[in-house]
């Protein structure tokens, strides 16, 4: 598994074309985002990195430089990104790929709308934000001490980060490759977008993984022909690791972990961001051309299926991370009066206890063009209240629908008034 931005590739699995077709009925063509309707390159970002730069320029925030880690730790703190989110990728899939090896993996940190990549000794930090209107926006930050650090927007990244694999919009992708002992990827072994629908056993090729997962297998921690041959004889000989000390020296890294649960959240999140960017772009273009979104209804249904995890690959064993990421993430809320939250994990049969994406609270969702946002909220209400009994959402039990509905009623701002009504069919 690996991440591209600035040449980042988030690598994992084997279901590429099928995923894209399921999402957009095969419409993986590039969106003309350089044209006036979107005007990606000409439009300044208003995302988290752009806002942080403004605060730095006004003197409201001062980043601290460390001789060993550069701006890394101070930047994580300024953006409220926990070091517990660290995941480690050793496949050579980055702008600075020559510096990445199994001995010097790239550390990837993230929160709901920012990704940061750090490589020991590398000249720049690789940074990506999710702008609510533009989607993925990519930056570098020179690892040189200065009184006024500057994030430099780099559209060169779109050579990899705007393709059918990112749903035709500026975005991110997670994939899984076998690598040799130097981290060079084998493109034949599975070049596919990975998210919560990908079977567990196909994930994390090219990544280190810490955490327990019973008899279930994955591709993590393996590099070189000998390791993969051993994995055929003893499938979990590098699985269920709670420490990476025998595999790599992580002195100087923010954490000694590459948390399994953090990886699972990362792969869900990256594809969600691409999905919502595509919806945003398509809605803008449809309204410009037709003044309606009737042609986008099937795309909306695909998004709702992803939002509600209806095609999630079931877990075959209980999984547990090692960095404390799960507890940190779950604590972020928001919570209803009963203490329930969409960030609560299950980790036995599925990722989340209440399968509705926490990113429904995101700025990107709230800033969808009004016709699309209203349509999605209406359809979501129909599903959660049991008015929609279609087989596409049959994986959601009446009890689960009711719980999600109650959580959203108490925690999601600016819901339409009809969401407050008590009519719930078959969910008592």
Predicted regions and their residues:
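Boundary at the C-terminal end of the N-terminal hydrophobic targeting segment
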Residues: 17-22
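Bacterial N-terminal signal peptides
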Residues: 2-16
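Generic N-terminal helix/loop capping motif
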Residues: 75-82, 86, 306, 310, ...
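Exposed alpha-helical structural elements
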Residues: 47-51, 67-75, 243, 302, ...
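N-terminal alpha-helical interaction blocks
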Residues: 24-122
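Substrate-recognition/cap regions that form aromatic- and gly/pro-loop-enriched pockets
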Residues: 308-377
């Amino acid at each position: 598994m690996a991440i591209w931005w600035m040449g980042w590739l988030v690598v994992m699995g084997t279901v590429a074309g099928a995923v894209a077709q399921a999402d957009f009925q095969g419409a993986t063509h590039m969106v003309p985002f350089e044209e006036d309707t979107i005007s990606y390159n000409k439009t300044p970002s208003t995302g988290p990195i752009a806002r942080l730069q403004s605060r730095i320029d006004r003197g409201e925030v001062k980043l601290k430089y460390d001789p060993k880690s550069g701006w890394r730790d101070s930047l994580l703190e300024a953006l409220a990104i926990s070091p517990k989110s660290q995941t480690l990728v050793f496949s050579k899939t980055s702008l600075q790929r020559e510096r990445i090896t199994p001995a010097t993996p790239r550390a990837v940190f993230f929160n709901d709308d920012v990704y940061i990549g750090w490589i020991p000794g590398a000249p720049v930090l690789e940074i990506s934000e999710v702008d609510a209107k533009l989607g993925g926006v990519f930056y570098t930050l020179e690892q040189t001490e200065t009184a006024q650090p500057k994030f430099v927007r780099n559209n060169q990244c779109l050579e990899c980060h705007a393709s059918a694999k990112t749903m035709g919009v500026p975005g991110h992708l997670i994939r899984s490759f076998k690598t040799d002992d130097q981290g060079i990827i084998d493109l034949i072994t599975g070049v596919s977008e990975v998210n919560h629908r990908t079977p567990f056993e196909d994930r994390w090729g090219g990544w280190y993984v810490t955490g327990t997962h019973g008899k279930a297998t994955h591709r993590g921690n393996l590099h070189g022909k000998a390791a993969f041959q051993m994995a055929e004889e003893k499938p979990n000989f590098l699985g269920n690791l709670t420490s990476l000390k025998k595999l790599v020296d992580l002195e100087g890294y923010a954490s000694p972990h590459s948390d399994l649960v953090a990886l699972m959240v990362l792969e869900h999140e990256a594809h969600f961001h691409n999905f919502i960017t595509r919806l945003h772009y398509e809605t803008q273009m449809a309204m410009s051309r037709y003044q309606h979104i009737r042609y986008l209804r099937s795309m909306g249904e695909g998004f709702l299926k992803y939002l509600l995890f209806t095609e999630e690959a079931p877990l075959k064993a209980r999984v547990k991370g090692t960095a404390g990421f799960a507890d940190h993430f779950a604590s972020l809320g928001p919570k209803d009066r009963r203490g329930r939250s969409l960030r609560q994990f299950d980790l036995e049969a599925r990722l989340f206890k209440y399968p509705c994406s926490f990113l429904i609270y995101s700025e990107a969702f709230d800033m969808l063009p009004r016709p699309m946002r209203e349509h999605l909220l209406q359809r979501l209400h129909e599903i959660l209240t049991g008015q929609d009994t279609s087989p596409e959402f049959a994986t959601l039990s009446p009890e689960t629908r009711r719980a999600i509905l109650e959580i959203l009623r108490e925690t999601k701002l600016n819901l339409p008034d009809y969401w407050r009504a008590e009519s719930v069919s078959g969910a008592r």
